[in-house]
Amino acid sequence: MASLGPSPWAPLSTPAPTAQLLLFLLLQVSAQPQGLSGMQGEPSLGDSSSGEDELGVDVLPSEEDAPEEADPPDGEDPPEVNSEDRMEESLGLEDLSTPEAPEHSQGSHGDEKGGGHSHWSYGGTLLWPQVSPACAGRFQSPVDIRLERTAFCRTLQPLELLGYELQPLPELSLSNNGHTVQLTLPPGLKMALGPGQEYRALQLHLHWGTSDHPGSEHTVNGHRFPAEIHVVHLSTAFSELHEALGRPGGLAVLAAFLQESPEENSAYEQLLSHLEEISEEGSKIEIPGLDVSALLPSDLSRYYRYEGSLTTPPCSQGVIWTVFNETVKLSAKQLHTLSVSLWGPRDSRLQLNFRATQPLNGRTIEASFPAAEDSSPEPVHVNSCFTAGDILALVFGLLFAVTSIAFLLQLRRQHRHRSGTKDRVSYSPAEMTETGA
């Protein structure tokens, strides 16, 4: 029997060069760095009417001003920090007002005032895993943001804050918990990190150094800023804080660096002017409500995003960090007031309350703008924010598209072949001849 033509499945039997290339890309997926979904500034000086500035090497503290520390190689424990050089602090359960917080996680309140529960200390970070095993986790915070290694992700949209402009009444609780100054926020302050990722604000607090040493938690290219603000949020998918601890995306923190400026920041003065009233550990007062959004940068579109942890015990992981590129400017007097007004445990001045930066261990820090490109005078490769799953989906989609197109083209060729064969066949009626009988 004669063949009807080439098989329509021929494109599948012999891989085309395009398909071979896609298969090669598929094999390279495993080499991609780990992004957010895989784990569960170089700004210049400039005038800003809001009293803010962008991150830049020219506005960063000098190397001699910053405490000497470097991230250890991936997979190794961070170096021990000398307790005489500084203290460390960050987001712990004592900073997240909740009745569900375990007693041993409530900080060092009352250590010499009649209290007796166990607690962590800033000078003994290597002992933190004994308080909470999560402190030895691989995805801890804070981290050093290396601009040239950030991954530009176009899907990161400007943040929208709802209800952050509070009225003077009702009043808010401002407290000194022995580790930081904390402002408890009322219900109604909401934000979204993306579709289906809604959060409500719980509280805000600060981290600072001294007049000689800057005290931000995160660093940029190894440089530390004078201070840092954190606004802590709980995912609306959870009704209680303890339910969200350790869950991917259960908590989200907005962080911004505080930078020295000749001018006073009126928004921060509404907080700093009350510090003398809560100078003693454990003290608390009520202050008028204020515009919380004014404590953050005016540009909410340029930021860095990564998944990390609380930075004090229990060091729960799964926290989504958003670190803004634009800094907030305070006067030198205001920064000094922040660093000398409060007292902590054992009648020690509350200063240098930040944790050492932690190794990334394969994590990718995403950026909502091409920070890697801006940070170097020479052309650099801008990393992709696509995760391994995104790349797999893209590769398989392209393979399916190429195969489908090849199949359709083959069917079309076969159809044309059949049509041409029919056109070449002519019909001639048989002639009848008369024959004599």
UniProtKB/Swiss-Prot annotation:
Q: Where in the cell is it found?
A: Nucleus; Nucleus, Nucleolus; Cell membrane; Cell projection, Microvillus membrane
Query: In what way is its activity controlled?
Result: Inhibited by acetazolamide.
- Known catalysed reaction(s)? hydrogencarbonate + H(+) = CO2 + H2O
The organism named in the record is: Mus musculus
Top-level lineage group: Eukaryota
- The protein's enzyme class: lyase
UniProt PTM comment: Asn-325 bears high-mannose type glycan structures.
Biological processes, Gene Ontology terms = morphogenesis of an epithelium; response to hypoxia; response to testosterone; response to xenobiotic stimulus; secretion
- Return the protein name: Carbonic anhydrase 9
| Gene label | Ca9
Q: Which cofactors, if any, are listed as required?
A: Zn(2+)
